[in-house]
């Protein structure tokens, strides 16, 4: 039997109450959905207050907190949880490594909480930040495994947190934006480290060397660069971020004009493997495999599939010892 779930949407048309236009609906973020549904179903509230607006359940409208005249219809939809969809891949900045992590897990979680609270305020997403913090508070005195599993789940959600981490990742190493990404180390670093630690050392049962796939939209210049590297003496490179892939090729092919195909060369060490996080993710149907920062790979070849009109770039994941 197909499992069902509830999602809330707001009408995004320029004139949201017009009956002459085709309706356009935008989905609330994962955390907003959770807050809304809990207020509607569990708490039986007449309304729920979010960061920028509140929702009147009786009239099914979203109302601006700053201007009550700004209203939009909302709707509650029951969908199949295993719908065939795959979200855009998400990224993470390089983490800070604490040598005393074994004895400081509670302190690290508390630092992550403070950082998320700060970033939530900057983004105007205090409600989302509060919800995320509540989840971390529940596990801060638990085992490393339970803390890591919570962080994986939070990372898998559509929220301001992963978007800010994604944006920061793009700036790392960019001298023109050095002040920006360095300013995020204190606030985003602790949460990034919790993720990194779990992926590196915990839950070996989730390790996998299966072939995984990732869709991307590349320019002609970027594709040419990959082709150039395959002809160079050293085709090895490394991931600077957390990289999300899927075990499902068909789903990955939904995105962009290019498909990356990742294959692990050897099972020489658990550190060379990748983690299947589908059982921990909010979206298990995506069949997500997460590759941690620092993983090295070789660019093997670049091909063009005429039938699908896509470039396919084949990469082999290698261990640290193979990069020397």
Feature roles, as predicted:
Residues 126-278:
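Internal glycine-rich, Lys/Arg-flanked active-site/core loops of soluble domains
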Residues 13-16, 53-55, 61, 67-69, ...:
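Conserved beta-strand elements of beta-rich interaction domains across eukaryotes
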Residues 269-293:
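Flexible, small-/acidic-enriched active-site or ligand-binding loops
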Residues 1-127, 138, 193:
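Eukaryote-biased intrinsically disordered, low-complexity acidic regions enriched in Ser/Thr/Pro
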Residues 307-324:
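Short solvent-exposed strand/turn elements
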């Amino acid at each position: 039997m197909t499992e069902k779930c509830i999602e809330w949407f707001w009408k995004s048309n320029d004139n949201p109450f017009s009956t002459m236009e085709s309706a356009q609906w935008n989905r609330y973020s994962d955390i907003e959905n959770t807050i809304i549904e809990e207020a509607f179903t569990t708490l039986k509230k007449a309304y729920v207050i979010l960061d920028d607006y509140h929702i009147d359940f009786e009239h099914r409208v979203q109302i601006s907190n700053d201007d009550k005249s700004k209203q939009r219809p909302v709707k509650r939809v029951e969908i199949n949880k295993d719908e065939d969809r795959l979200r855009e891949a998400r990224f993470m900045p390089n983490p800070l490594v604490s040598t005393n992590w074994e004895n400081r897990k509670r302190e690290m979680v508390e630092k992550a909480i403070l950082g998320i609270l700060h970033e939530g305020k900057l983004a105007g997403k205090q409600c989302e930040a509060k919800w995320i913090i509540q989840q971390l508070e529940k596990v801060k005195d638990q085992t490393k495994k339970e803390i890591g599993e919570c962080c994986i789940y939070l990372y898998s959600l559509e929220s301001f947190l992963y978007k800010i981490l994604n944006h920061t990742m793009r700036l790392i190493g960019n001298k023109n934006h050095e002040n920006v990404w360095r300013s995020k180390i204190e606030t985003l670093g602790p949460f990034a480290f919790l993720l990194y630690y779990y992926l590196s050392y915990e839950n070996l049962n989730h390790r996998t060397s299966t072939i995984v796939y990732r869709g991307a939209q590349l320019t002609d210049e970027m594709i040419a660069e990959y082709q150039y590297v395959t002809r160079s003496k050293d085709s090895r490179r490394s991931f600077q971020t957390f990289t999300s892939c899927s075990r499902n090729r068909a789903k990955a092919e939904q995105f962009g004009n290019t498909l990356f195909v990742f294959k692990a060369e050897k099972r020489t060490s658990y550190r060379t493997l990748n983690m299947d996080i589908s059982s921990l993710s909010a979206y298990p149907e995506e069949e997500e495999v997460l590759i941690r920062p620092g993983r090295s790979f070789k660019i093997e070849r670049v091909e063009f599939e005429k039938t699908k009109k896509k470039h396919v770039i084949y990469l082999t994941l290698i261990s640290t010892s193979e990069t020397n």
